[in-house]
Amino acid sequence: ELVFRNAKAELCGDRKMGLIKYVMALMNGARLGIAAQSVGVSEAAYREALSYARERRQFGKAIIEFPAVYEMLSLMKAKLDASRSLLYETTRFVDMYKTLEDISKESKLEKEERAEMKMYQKQADAFTPLAKGMGSEFCNQNAYDCVQIHGGSGFMKDYACERIYRDARITSIYEGTTQLQVVAAIRHVTTGTYLNMMKLYESQEISPDLIPLRNRLKTMAETYERIVTKVTETKDPEYIDFHARRMVEMAGHIIMGHLLLLDTTR
C-alpha cells in the first residue's frame, strides 16, 4: 500500500465548490446524455415493433390490424415523441444557459442578461432530472412492449428486440436511478418551478383545433396544483417523499403534453 502524507497538489477549480458545483455540473451533463440515449433506444424499440407487426401475419392479416397490438404501438409512439420533446426542451435551456455563461467570461452581462442566464440555469436544473427520469422509464416501457409484440420470438436472439431490452435497462440505473431523479426533481415541484412552466406553456399560441386538448391539460394542472398544495401543507418530509414520485410524474406528463401541442403547432 502506497500512502502520501502532506503531499502538495494543484487545486482544480475553487475550494468548497467540488460537490456543489463541479460534480453536479458533471452529473447533469451525463444525465442529459442518458436522456438522449433513452430516446434513441426507445426509437429503436418502436421501429422494431412496428416493422414486425406489419410483417407478421396471423389469422389471415398482419397483427398490426389487431386492436391490442395497434394500441400498444400508439402508446409507444406517444411515449417516444413525448420524451423526445422533453429532451429537446431541456437541451434548449442548457444551450441558452451555457451560451450566456460563456459570454459572461469574456464581457460583463447586462442586468437583464444576468437575470436571463439565471432563469435558464434554473430551468435546466429542473428539466434535466425530469428528462432523464421520464425518458429512461419510457424507454424501458417501450422496450418491454417491443418484446411483447414479438411474442416468444422477442425473447430469442433472432430478433434485435432482446438486445434492445437489455440496452434499455441500464438507462434508468446509471448516473442516478429514477428514484434519485425524483429526489432531484421534487424540489422543483414544491417550489412551483414546474407549475410556472405549465402556466408559461398555457399562454403560448397553438393551433385552434388543439385548444380542447390544452383545456384538458389545464384541468390536469389545476388538479396537480391542489395535490401539491395538500401534500406540502403537511410539512412532513417523509410524507412528501412518499408521494414525490407521483407528483414528479404528474408534472412530467403535463409538461410533455404541452410540448407535444407546441411541436404539433410548429
What are the roles of these predicted feature ranges?
Residues 1-226:
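Internal glycine-rich alpha/beta core junctions
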Residues 192, 203-266:
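C-terminal amphipathic alpha-helical interaction region
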